[in-house]
A protein has these predicted regions:
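Interdomain coupling/hinge region of P-loop NTPase helicase/AAA+ cores
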Residues: 7, 75, 103-106, 115, ...
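Residue-level signature of catalytic and energy-coupling elements of molecular machines
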Residues: 17, 29, 45, 61, ...
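Nucleotide phosphate-binding site architecture
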Residues: 23, 62, 66, 84, ...
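Hydrophobic/aromatic position at a conserved helix-loop-beta junction
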Residues: 37-38, 120, 199
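The conserved Walker
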Residues: 47-51
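Conserved nucleic-acid-binding Ia/Ib motif block in the N-terminal RecA-like helicase ATPase lobe
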Residues: 11-19, 69-138, 146-149, 192-196, ...
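Conserved pre-motif I regulatory segment
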Residues: 1-46
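Walker A/P-loop NTP-binding motif
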Residues: 33-41, 54-69, 85, 89-95, ...
Length: 238
C-alpha cells in the first residue's frame, strides 16, 4: 500500500489529515487520488459507504484549487443537507493549512441571506444541495463560470430522488469543459445510463463488488406512531 505522499498529496493536506488520524490511504483513495491529480478525465467511482470517498475526491479537488482566486472553482452536489454539511466540514478540516481557501455549504432550511454573504466574500469550493444552489444562481450570487470540477456525491440517490432536472439546470451554468466526478456506493444500470449523460471521456473505478452494500453497516427500524417519533428517537439516542 502506498503512502499519501506517494499518491502525490501536498504537504499542507498531509499535515491536516495526519492530525485527523489518517495513516494509510484506503483502497478507494489509493485508486482515485493519483488518477484525479494526474488526469483530467471524468470519473464514476463506486465504493461502499464508510470507505473514505469524501477524501478520495476531496483531496484532489482541494489540491487543484487556486486559493489566490476567490471565485468558485469546484462544486460538490449532495442530496441532503446533512451530507452537505458533513462534506463541507471534512473539506475545511483537510484544507486547514491552505491559506486563503474557503469552503461554503449552501442548503435549504437555513438563511439564504447568510449563505449569500458567505459567497460574496469569496469561496473557491461550494458544497450544495441542488435546490438551494439554483436559488442562489437565480439571484446572481452563485456564479459558476470558473468551475473546473463538479462532484456528485451519492449520485444514485440524487438521480433516484428526482434531482435530474435541477442537476441539468446547474450543469448549464458551468463550463462545458469541466470535469465531472460521480461518487456513489451503488448504482443501478438504469441510473448509470442517466449519469453517463453528464460525463465526457470517463473512467469507471470500482472498489469491492459492484453495487454491494457496506459490510459494517447494520440496519434496524422501529415502528412507532407519527406523534411518538420524536420521543422514540430521543430514547434511542439516549
Amino acid at each position: 500500500m502506498k503512502t499519501f505522499e506517494e499518491l502525490g498529496v501536498s504537504e499542507e493536506i498531509r499535515r491536516a489529515i495526519e492530525e485527523l488520524g489518517f495513516e494509510q490511504p484506503m483502497p478507494v483513495q489509493e485508486a482515485v487520488i493519483p488518477y484525479l491529480l494526474g488526469n483530467g478525465n471524468d470519473v464514476i467511482a463506486l465504493a461502499q459507504t464508510g470507505t473514505g470517498k469524501t477524501a478520495a475526491y476531496g483531496i484532489p479537488v482541494l489540491q487543484k484549487v487556486d486559493p489566490t482566486q476567490k471565485e468558485p472553482q469546484a462544486l460538490i452536489l449532495s442530496p441532503t443537507r446533512e451530507l452537505c454539511l458533513q462534506i463541507a466540514d471534512d473539506l475545511s478540516d483537510f484544507s486547514k493549512y491552505i491559506n486563503g481557501l474557503h469552503v461554503v455549504a449552501v442548503y435549504g432550511g437555513a438563511s439564504i441571506e447568510m449563505q449569500s454573504r458567505q459567497l460574496r466574500k469569496g469561496a473557491q469550493i461550494i458544497v450544495a444541495t441542488p435546490g438551494r444552489l439554483i436559488d442562489l444562481m437565480k439571484r446572481g450570487v452563485a456564479k459558476l463560470d470558473a468551475v473546473c470540477n463538479v462532484v456528485l456525491d451519492e449520485a444514485d440517490e440524487m438521480l433516484n430522488m428526482g434531482f435530474s432536472e435541477s442537476i441539468n439546470a446547474i450543469f448549464e451554468g458551468v463550463p462545458s469543459d469541466r470535469n465531472t466526478l460521480l461518487f456513489s456506493a451503488t448504482m443501478s444500470r438504469e441510473i448509470e445510463k442517466i449519469a453517463k449523460s453528464y460525463l465526457h471521456d470517463y473512467k469507471e473505478i470500482v472498489v469491492g463488488s459492484r453495487n454491494e452494500g457496506a459490510e459494517k453497516v447494520n440496519h434496524i427500524y422501529y415502528m412507532v406512531h407519527a406523534k411518538d417519533k420524536y420521543l422514540a428517537l430521543k430514547r434511542i439516542v439516549d
